């Protein structure tokens, strides 16, 4: 599915589920890594993670579009468009937009660092580096040792 097909799909979803026209752009952004899509407040455009389509198909993209269109229409109407707002929760439930999408990578796949406590030998994996002088084992309070890095 290219950007043109994505645009027409979004316009049809907007009419079908929201009864309003989508008048801005929707496109794939390959730089999105940990999110399925995002609504940009300043330009009113919607960006979609192409990995979601590649891994999970059109159904996943439709769900992401519905979610982002909830942000879009509520923001343009001047209502609460954030996840915590009552208006957002009720609109997303009404149109069947899920709150989250399926992650493209698991935490284990994204982890770059592996640590082990020298006392109880509990292992910890982390995406970001940990300051070993400040951090201790959450289980026994022992000293952590870096085992391996992926970066």
Curated annotation (Swiss-Prot):
Family affiliation: Belongs to the SprT family.
Cofactor(s) recorded in Swiss-Prot or TrEMBL: Zn(2+)
Top-level taxon in the UniProt lineage: Bacteria
Residues covered by the SprT-like domain: 7-146
The entry's keywords: Cytoplasm, Metal-binding, Zinc
The protein, known as: Protein SprT-like
Protein's UniProt keywords contain Metal-binding: yes
Residues binding Zn(2+): 67, 71
Localization terms from the record: Cytoplasm
InterPro entries: SprT-like_domain, SprT_Zn_ribbon, Uncharacterised_SprT-like
Main location: cytoplasm
Active-site residues, as the UniProt record annotates them: 68
Cellular component GO terms held in the UniProt record: cytoplasm
Organism: Staphylococcus epidermidis (strain ATCC 35984 / DSM 28319 / BCRC 17069 / CCUG 31568 / BM 3577 / RP62A)
Molecular functions per Gene Ontology: zinc ion binding
Record's keyword annotation contains Transport: no
One of the GO BP terms on file: response to stress
Manner of cofactor binding, per the entry note: Binds 1 zinc ion.
């Amino acid at each position: 599915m290219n950007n043109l097909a994505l645009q027409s799909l979004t316009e049809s979803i907007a009419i079908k589920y929201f009864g309003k026209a989508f008048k801005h752009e929707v496109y794939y952004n390959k730089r999105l890594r940990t999110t399925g899509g995002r609504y940009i407040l300043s330009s009113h455009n919607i960006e979609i993670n192409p990995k979601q389509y590649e891994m999970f198909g059109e159904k996943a993209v439709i769900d992401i579009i519905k979610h982002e269109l909830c942000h879009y229409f509520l923001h343009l109407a001047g209502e609460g468009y954030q996840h915590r707002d009552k208006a957002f929760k009720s609109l997303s439930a009404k149109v069947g937009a899920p709150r989250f999408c399926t992650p493209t990578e698991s935490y284990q796949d994204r982890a770059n660092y592996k640590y082990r406590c020298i006392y109880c030998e509990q292992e910890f994996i982390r995406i970001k580096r940990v300051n070993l002088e400040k951090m201790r084992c959450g289980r026994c309070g022992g000293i952590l040792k870096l085992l391996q890095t992926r970066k």
